[in-house]
Amino acid sequence: MTNDRVQDEIRHALGVRPQIDPATEIARRVEFLVDYVLTTGVRGLVLGISGGQDSTLAGRLCQLAVEDLRRRGAEAEFWAVRLPHHVQNDEADAQDALSFIAADHELAINIGAATDATAEQYEKATGEQITDFGKGNVKARMRMIAQFELAGEKKALVVGTDHAAEAVTGFFTKFGDGAADVIPLAGLNKRQGRELLRHLGAPDHLIVKVPTADLLDDEPGQTDESSLGLSYDQIDDFLEGKEIEPAAASALIEKYRRSEHKRRTPVAPTDTWWIRH
């Protein structure tokens, strides 16, 4: 199968539209959240806010959704949660994001002590120090534990920030930031997310902020693009069906194939999707 055909299949599988209307997409995704909250009978939404593009956008959509729900007579609230590991270097951006989102409730749960305790117990049990990469994944999973803890107490849903540019590369922690009840940004690539933020009136410095997972102690602020070896422009072009450098296209296709397990529920003996033909 040619790369062009695989590219088209991936784009369709992830639900990416080459062109979008920001106002329409915002309305569609807010309505999706409203409908799902009403269907599940929960009382609200919970989302971790980092100060990056994705959580800023998802957070504003969540607040718009619960306001819409209340206008319809439903009980619904939104909890925006800061989840720093000790001290976050870009805390000012996180606070700016919270101001823009204007959530019903803001709170902070510091995951530093819990993450460090897990690392200490791992070293005690194995005699080995956990790698920086491994600890980074623990941070992501600890954040999700905290969000589900809050959501369980508030009878709410956990909102994830996964979008097409992350999904195609598998650039998320399995059962960490990849774990959520609902993902309203699905099908959007990075540049489309920026379009929605501009339409919503987000601060410019949050819209153009260089994306970083910020999970590594040894390399704080390492950019997504550095980790991926690809630019988001290349990823977005690929997802929109545009031609990109053959080497970049092949790299993306391989990342997509290798990360398929992250986009699936746990594999069972009856599953066949994982078998390479």
Please give the residue ranges for each predicted region.
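ATP-dependent adenylation/nucleotidyltransferase module used to activate substrates
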Residues: T2-T169
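A non-catalytic, amphipathic alpha-helix used as a structural packing/dimerization or gating element
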Residues: T24, R28-F32, L188-H199, A251
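Intrinsic disorder and flexible/low-complexity segments
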Residues: K242-H277
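Short, structured secondary-structure boundary patches
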Residues: A58, V66-R70, G127-D132, G178-P184, ...
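Catalytic subdomain that performs nucleotidyl-dependent activation
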Residues: E77, A103, K135, R143, ...
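Long, well-ordered amphipathic alpha-helical subdomains in the mid-to-C-terminal portions
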Residues: T212-S250, R257
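Predominant activation on well-ordered alpha-helical scaffold segments within soluble catalytic domains
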Residues: G59, Q63, Q95, F148, ...
